[in-house]
Amino acid sequence: MQIENSGVGRILRQLRWVLYPRRCPFCDRVLGSVSACPDCKEKLETLRRRPTFRLARERHYIKNLEGAAAPYRYAGCVRRGVLRAKFQAAPWAADELGVEMARLLFGSEVRMRGFGPEVETVPGLAIGYNCVVPVPASSRVRGYNVPERMARSVARAVGVPLEPKLLVRARSGKRQEGLSFDERLVNVSGAFRVTDP
């Protein structure tokens, strides 16, 4: 039995929320007992995208990719939230970004229970999905894996397993920062491979 999903795990998470209250990943405001930041709600709506889960064949950039989704444009407070998770020693921001992704993409809800939040798993939420697979993080040391933490929050919210070892880095690439869209596509081409299941 994993501690994370046990009664002990829930108690430890509650204790964590008492000592380190939830914060908005976008503006860093302490959220207290609210499930989402009221200050960022309007800003986030302007950055909202309509997710595309099934891609038309002619829009595939990655061979055999059946679907992809990005709930927000990478700008404004969303960009600040991602940068906070990546570069400001804020693993909690990665967790909260994952919760937000699950909320927007799958309709999961954050409910306040006791001293902190519990992401409510909605049965059948992820029908058609077997697992959540994070993109492998680069080798730069942060002390935690941002994509894996985000993916763990999504997996927990939709009730499917997290499989962090299914996709591995096949080769190193340049930093994506400062590259154009086309340069980014070339940079990640062949950078990852699927492991044997």
Whereabouts are the PLM-identified features?
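Glycine-rich phosphate/pyrophosphate-handling loop used in enzymes and phosphotransfer proteins
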Residues: M1-P197
